[in-house]
Structure formats: structure tokens, C-alpha cells
């Protein structure tokens, strides 16, 4: 079993460059299926396990997909006849695979997609995707582990109110509506920057979408979309993670291409904790204080505080003076990392949907297991300031969302390495796969 070993006590200094946003690239790649003419060229694609997974889904649907991990570019040609069924073996690894449902339904009037593992209707808002399709005239059948959608002719524009501002539902409905007949209005839409990025991509392809980034999105359907070129926005969650890394170590780190407008809620909370966030040409500089001051955080849909930064901020609050409270309102059961923090001597307790953090915890290195993607990063961050060695396992979660995080932290001054069960330094499997695919392409 691979693990990341961190030795605490090293201040971080230097410059780090962000990757393209994972949460933006997956829907953009799925949306490429709508283009019945031309090729799409997607730039600043992060070299992540999830990107390889969605590329395999697209290839299985008969799209031509080439990923050059060196230039971080994906070329997609979906102009040929596509398959309209995505089987379980390709979708089981990633819930975002359900995003191919809207594009296939809009283009062909039929789509059948396996339900990703653990994605039960009701507990996750995929029901909002399906209600949106039904409002546009589709017939939905759920059974035997699949979602099947059919419509006679074109989808019809509709007025759709989302019971909650689900990012995935907003994206899927927006993609489907791009080819629908007439006007679609999505109310209580998600406002995340990734929604805006997807709308920009669709509009470059020939769609007519206005209002992305607000609670009301209006789409006038068109006859067809064409392939285009698009650059993915920087990853705001990776930015937030490195902000915390600098702050927790009392460091001075410049985050290249970080965008303040995508990070206002995170910056606000960091500044409340005495962290300096300085605008510089091309990014943000984060200077950690001698003493961190605790604060309270409540996760909310954008532009509120992002749930994907909750666990990282928890690690920071472990080192802050005073008592802090984090309340999670977006997802259930997102405090599984608390028990791992306790193994590191954290003074922390759960009360309902809140966590109470008593600083200053004298953190001790321990063997801990990542429970999800962001928890993996949070445990590494805590390890940066722990006494002794922290060993983080279950790295499959980390590889879904962070590119070269070990190398990037090491370049900033962290004592950190990734090793196999024999203690030999290794790279993530997706990096090995990327090198092999590029060597094959070169041949």
C-alpha cells in the first residue's frame, strides 16, 4: 500500500502554479459529445485519475479522444455516430460520469447511463437532473442499476426550478437545453465559477446561454453545436489548499494564476485568522502569521464558503488560538476525517452538523487514512506542522483531485515523499499512465 510520509516543522516558501480545475474540466469534456461537427481542443487539462476515467467513458461512446499530458491538452472529435449507452464498468469509478446523460439525450433523444456506485437517488441530487429532463419532455426509467432517458424528437424548452442549487444538475440541464427546441429557464441554479466556465465553452460551440453565475440561467436552444477551443479555469480548491499550506506553516507562498474573485469566501476567513492575502501580478501571495486566530465557518453553495475547503480549514483551525466552529450544510457525513485528526492529538468534537475545534492542538505525527479527496489534503496539511512523522494512506482519494501535490509541497520546502510498501519513492499511478501514453503517442 502506498503512503505519503510528512515530517513536520518546515516553513513553506516559494511559488506554486495551479492546475486547471478538476470540477470544470469534467463537465467540459462531457459537453464535447454535443458537437456534431468539428473537433474540440481543451487546454490546461489537469493530469488526474478522474480525467483518465471520463476519457475512457467518452471513448466507449465512440468519441475520438487524445490526451497529451505533457501539454495538458485533450483533443475530442465526436462528429461521428456515437453510442448512447455508458455501461457500469466505465462509470463505476466516478459519479461525474452521469454528466454524459444530458449531452447524449439532447443529441440523440436517447441515453442510458449506469448509476455510479453509491449514488442512490434521493440521497444525492441526481433526482434534480432527472426532474429537469422530465420537464423538457423526456421519459425517465430507473432500474437494474441504470438511468434511461428517451424523448420523441427534440427536447422542449421549459421553466425548471431546482429545489437546491445543485452544480451537477445545473450543468446537465444546461447542456441538454443547448439543443432543445425553444427557451429553457433554470431557476435557483448553481452559481459556481465552473458553471460559468461550462457556459462559456458551450457558447463558443454555438449555444445561446445567458445568466451563468447567477441564480437564473436562460438558454435558447440551437440546431447544432460545433467543436471549438477552450482553456479550463484555474482550480480554486487547489488554490485554497495551498493557501492553507502557507498559512499553517507561517510561510510565504505566491500562488500563480489564483483568482481572487473565485476565492472571496475563503480569503475572508483566512484574513479573519490573521493571514495576509496580497494581490500580485498574476496571482495571490499568502503570508502566514506568527499566531493564527480561530474563526467560525459555515459551508454554503457558492458564493458561500465551499464545502470542498471545509477539511483543509479544519486543519488550519487546529493550530489557531481560541475555539472555532465549522458547520457543514452542503453534504451529510463529511466529518469522517475528524477521527483521523484525533489520532494526531487534535482537540476536536462533533455536535450534529458542526465540529468544535479547540486550539492550539500540539499535533503529533501518526498513521492516518484519507476518507475522501479533500480529507486526504487536510491530513497532509496537518502533517506539515505535526511533531514527528505523519503517514497518510488510502491515496486513491488524493489522486482524484490533486496533481503532483507531493512534488509541489516539496518544492516549497516541505519534507514529504510518497513511497510504496517497501519504502521506495514512487509517483502516482496516473503519472505513470501519462508517461506511458505519451511514449506510445511519440512512437
Curated annotation (Swiss-Prot):
One of its GO terms (molecular function) is UDP-N-acetylglucosamine 1-carboxyvinyltransferase activity. The active site is at 119 (proton donor). It comes from the Bacteria. Phosphoenolpyruvate binds at residues 22-23. CDD domains: UdpNAET. It catalyses: phosphoenolpyruvate + UDP-N-acetyl-alpha-D-glucosamine = UDP-N-acetyl-3-O-(1-carboxyvinyl)-alpha-D-glucosamine + phosphate. UDP-N-acetyl-alpha-D-glucosamine binds at residues 95, 124-128, 308, 330. It is found in: Cytoplasm. GO terms for biological process: cell division; cell wall organization; peptidoglycan biosynthetic process; regulation of cell shape; UDP-N-acetylgalactosamine biosynthetic process. Its EC number is 2.5.1.7. The modification 2-(S-cysteinyl)pyruvic acid O-phosphothioketal is found at residue 119. Its main location: cytoplasm. Pathway: Cell wall biogenesis; peptidoglycan biosynthesis. Belongs to the EPSP synthase family. MurA subfamily. Cell wall formation. Adds enolpyruvyl to UDP-N-acetylglucosamine. HAMAP family: MurA. This is UDP-N-acetylglucosamine 1-carboxyvinyltransferase 1. It comes from Oceanobacillus iheyensis (strain DSM 14371 / CIP 107618 / JCM 11309 / KCTC 3954 / HTE831).
